[in-house]
């Protein structure tokens, strides 16, 4: 189903923001991860949008869901492979983008593999295509470079205030009941290429969360925090550093996580510690092609 002009306008505004932020982005060894994340998020706001999720800064074997912690002292390393995954929304309509920087200058082919896979995948998107075909194209491209796709990370459909709205876009030749794309669908395609075995696992570190639904708690501060989070972020992911700036609020957040009101997104790491690259675009599915939102 075709979207209305207001929806399309907001998607385009969000896309212009993420494109502008990424074009202006400079990554160098020694940069503070915390300062970089805050700079990206403030830049999104200064351009008229809001962050759709915390700026993800995932280095080397860390593939996804990594953002700065409160008081984070980490620095970008001299030879890091740095994945920057950002999202902006305008009235809930989201643009989701990612690029990778190779500070060593030694991993160009790894970056090329995921970027080429993205371009090839976008080229076959149209109404009526099974998402399995997209996964096949991504895997074929990445393997042609001698690398593996990360099989348990996927692209996804987008909805208003929904970063993941139900449809998964595989990054490998999945066999099963893949969804059929329809005209007007908005999807984020994000191939991950790796020198490792192609599987990510959860780590013990978590900085990103999202509201699910409110469950009973005796903690008044926790109840108030949940209402605040829902009003401000809806179901979109948020960072602990955005909401828990005091001991009381940290305790409140932990109570909400413990009782299931808040969902956690642990940092994901390639299982064999292989380097990972990522590129991502948001596209609108059209009758005979796809519109790249840039």
Each model region followed by its residue ranges:
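Active-site neighborhoods and metal-handling regions in enzymes and metal-associated proteins
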Residues: 1-294
């Amino acid at each position: 189903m075709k979207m209305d002009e207001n929806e399309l306008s907001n998607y385009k505004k969000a896309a212009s923001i993420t494109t502008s932020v990424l074009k202006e982005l400079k990554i160098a060894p020694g940069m503070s991860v915390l300062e970089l994340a805050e700079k990206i998020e403030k830049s999104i706001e200064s351009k008229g949008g809001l962050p759709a999720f915390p700026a993800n800064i995932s280095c080397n074997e860390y593939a996804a869901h990594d953002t700065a912690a409160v008081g984070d002292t980490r620095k970008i390393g001299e030879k890091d492979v740095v994945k920057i995954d950002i999202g902006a929304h305008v009235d809930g309509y989201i643009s989701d983008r990612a690029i990778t920087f190779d500070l060593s200058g030694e991993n160009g082919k790894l970056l090329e593999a995921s970027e080429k896979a993205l371009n090839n995948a976008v080229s076959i998107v149209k109404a009526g295509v099974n998402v399995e075909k997209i996964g096949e194209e991504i895997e074929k491209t990445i393997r042609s470079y001698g690398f593996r796709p990360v099989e348990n990370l996927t692209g996804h459909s987008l909805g208003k205030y929904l970063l993941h709205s139900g449809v998964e876009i595989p990054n490998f030749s999945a066999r099963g009941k893949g969804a059929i794309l329809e005209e007007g669908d908005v999807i984020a395609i994000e191939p991950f290429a790796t020198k490792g075995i192609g599987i990510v696992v959860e780590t013990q570190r978590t900085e990103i969360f999202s509201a699910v639904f409110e469950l009973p708690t005796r903690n008044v501060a926790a109840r108030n925090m949940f209402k605040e989070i829902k009003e401000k972020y809806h179901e979109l992911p948020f960072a602990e550093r955005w909401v828990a700036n005091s001991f009381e609020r940290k305790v409140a957040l932990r109570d909400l996580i413990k009782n299931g009101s808040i969902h956690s997104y642990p940092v994901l790491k390639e299982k064999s510690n292989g380097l990972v690259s990522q590129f991502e675009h948001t596209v609108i599915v059209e009758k005979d092609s796809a519109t790249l939102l840039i």
